């Protein structure tokens, strides 16, 4: 983690469980902003690929983590991602903040 970054106002570190996957790909920051929670992450070198942009695998893991947070808070029970598809729109450069929001439209039984 880059200790020189300035965390945007209103965001707090998102607590992850030590030793679990999400603890290795952050840190994430969170802002509870009714009616929507917003996550951000600073893209530093450890999250980048050889092109100095966010690694696609990280972006997918980040999307899955944020989506899981929203899904769990909707159903209040353990959930899993059954399917996750992504079409990348544009790269996220090292040194940028990446914001994520999610919306649960439907839920299934699997």
Indicate where each model-derived feature is located.
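Terminal targeting signals and extreme-terminal segments of soluble enzymes
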Residues: 1-110
């Amino acid at each position: 983690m880059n200790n020189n970054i300035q965390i945007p106002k209103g965001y707090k570190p998102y607590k992850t469980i030590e030793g679990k996957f999400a603890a290795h790909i952050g840190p994430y920051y969170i802002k509870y902003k009714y009616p929507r929670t917003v996550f951000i992450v600073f893209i530093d070198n450890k999250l980048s690929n050889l092109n100095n942009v966010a690694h696609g695998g990280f972006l997918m893991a980040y999307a899955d983590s944020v989506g899981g947070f929203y899904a769990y808070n909707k159903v209040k029970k353990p959930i899993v991602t059954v399917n996750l598809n992504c079409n990348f729109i544009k790269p996220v450069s090292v040194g940028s903040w990446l914001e994520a929001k999610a919306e649960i439209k439907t839920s299934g039984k699997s």
